Regions:
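N-terminal Rossmann-like or analogous alpha/beta NTP/dinucleotide-binding catalytic cores
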Residues: 1-83, 173-187, 227
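Catalytic adenosine-cofactor/nucleotide-binding cores of aminoacyl-tRNA synthetases and other
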Residues: 8, 173, 185-290
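Alpha-helix initiation and N-capping motif
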Residues: 15, 48, 52, 71-74, ...
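Short glycine-enriched loop/turn motifs at secondary-structure junctions
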Residues: 35-38, 160, 212
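Active-site cores that bind ATP or allylic diphosphates and position pyrophosphate for catalysis
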Residues: 57-60, 64-194, 199-206, 214, ...
């Protein structure tokens, strides 16, 4: 497990909440925070030198560049694009500027190819293609020295020998960026699988407006970890057309990427409550009192 941080959005206690939820669900990690391992450090702020060195390496190889555009200029650019009804994206103003030695605030952007296509195989969706002209020169390293998700996930996954990347489908459109970073660095990319989103009853993306969204809030409401684990595992995945109740060991034994669906999964509180009640009725009085 590697903890990635966005300094501007850090919430006090968030890390402890995440780790606490994983521990409550018995989702133990082989290595990472609190455990250690051979691929540390496991906190992004302790890995900054890795991202910075790799970003500078890409600049030296003319695969990335310093961007000196101010936030004010970028705001005006976006407003102009909106007025002209143009798709949003960086206009590559700094792409061919010489790199200066002066200490001018800057970010590092990746030189994404303008022509052609970028394709990759998704284990759930098959071959996916993107026209390169739809992807802008994205920021890899911010002015404060912190990486964006695009750079951090490629560097961490490569250095930690990650073979499979399973993440929400909202990251599908970012995958061409990651594929090109892998290519630029000479890394072999992992296998990708983009999971369907969890939806509310109105079929929109699950959010706070749909009610409780924190795992630990459900714990505090009396839901059992076994029921929550079982319920979450069946959001977008199924063993067959009828099996609903499965123990953690059964879910682990039978899980396969091939049975993950493409459509979004509805978060049904009624089903979770039914499943929780079933697990409670199977427990002894002594187990319930623990």
């Amino acid at each position: 497990m590697c903890i990635r941080q966005d300094v501007s959005r850090t919430v006090e206690g968030a890390l402890e909440s995440i780790l606490g939820a994983l521990e409550w669900l018995a989702l133990d990690w082989d290595e990472g925070p609190r455990v250690g391992g051979n691929y540390g450090p496991y906190v992004q702020s302790e890995r900054l030198h890795l991202y910075q060195d790799i970003a500078e390496k890409l600049v030296a190889e003319d695969k990335a560049y310093y961007c000196y555009c101010t936030s004010e200029r970028l705001k005006l650019m976006r407003e102009d694009q909106t007025q002209r009804k143009q798709p949003p994206g960086y206009d590559r103003t700094c792409r061919d500027l010489p790199t200066t030695e002066e200490q001018i605030p800057h970010v590092i952007r990746f030189k994404f190819p303008v022509d052609g296509e970028t394709s990759f195989n998704d284990l759930i969706r098959g071959e996916v293609k993107f026209s390169n002209h739809t992807v802008d020169d994205f920021v890899m390293l911010k002015s404060d020295g912190y990486p964006t998700y695009h750079l951090a996930n490629v560097v961490d996954d490569h250095l930690m020998d990650i073979t499979h990347v399973l993440r929400a489908e909202e990251w599908l459109s970012s995958t061409p960026k990651h594929v090109k970073i892998y290519d630029a660095l000479g890394y072999d990319p992992p296998l990708f699988a983009h999971l369907p989103l969890i939806l509310g009853p109105d079929r929109s993306k699950l959010s706070k407006r749909h009610g409780e969204v924190s795992v630990l809030q459900y714990r505090d409401m009396g839901y059992l970890p076994e029921a929550m684990f079982n319920f979450l595992a069946l959001l977008g995945w199924a063993l067959d057309d009828h099996t609903e109740l499965m123990s953690i060991s059964e879910l682990i034994e039978n899980f396969s990427i091939e049975r993950i669906g493409k459509a979004g999964a509805i978060f049904s509180l009624e089903k979770l409550t039914w499943m929780n009640g079933t697990y409670i009725r199977q427990m002894t009085s002594s187990d319930l009192s623990k």
